[in-house]
């Protein structure tokens, strides 16, 4: 399955589970489809997702990760005051790390906007087992 087919499938499944999206028009251009998919991921309410959906989502995210590249810790420089602390300005989804502190607001919940870069089903679905 190519990237466009994965996006089409994922958008279709997200439309099926939300009646408010029934009449949503899906753009034809790949870049616009990707923006729509990101918005749908970010505004999806927590609920179970099918194994097939999660598998295709994971494949799609691996493709996107490969396109954008991964930044590893050994390519970064710590701050002089504490060698355990690294500051990063850029796309945090590219970092190969265990934890991120992003105190963007007083609730520490981050941004709840549809076009925020990362708020995927992996994060919001309480029933999905976490692999360590």
PLM feature spans:
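Short glycine-rich anion-binding loops that position phosphate/pyrophosphate groups of nucleotides
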Residues: 106-107
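Long amphipathic N-terminal alpha/beta scaffold segment
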Residues: 59-103, 114
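Charge-patterned, phosphorylation-rich low-complexity C-terminal interaction regions
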Residues: 117-118
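Cytochrome P450 core scaffold surrounding the K-helix E-X-X-R motif
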Residues: 110-111
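Single conserved hydrophobic/aromatic residue that forms the stacking wall/gate
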Residues: 121-132
């Amino acid at each position: 399955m190519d990237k466009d087919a994965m996006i089409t499938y994922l958008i279709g499944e997200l439309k099926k589970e939300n009646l408010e999206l029934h009449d949503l028009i899906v753009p034809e251009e790949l870049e616009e489809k990707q923006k729509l998919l990101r918005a749908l991921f970010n505004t999806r309410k927590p609920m179970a997702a099918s194994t097939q959906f999660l598998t295709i989502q994971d494949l799609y995210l691996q493709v996107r990760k490969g396109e954008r590249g991964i930044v590893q810790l050994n390519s970064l420089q710590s701050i002089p005051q504490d060698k355990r602390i690294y500051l990063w300005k850029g796309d945090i989804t590219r970092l190969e790390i265990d934890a991120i502190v992003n105190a963007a607001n007083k609730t520490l919940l981050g941004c709840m906007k549809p076009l925020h870069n990362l708020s995927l089903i992996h994060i919001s679905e309480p029933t999905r087992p976490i692999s360590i």
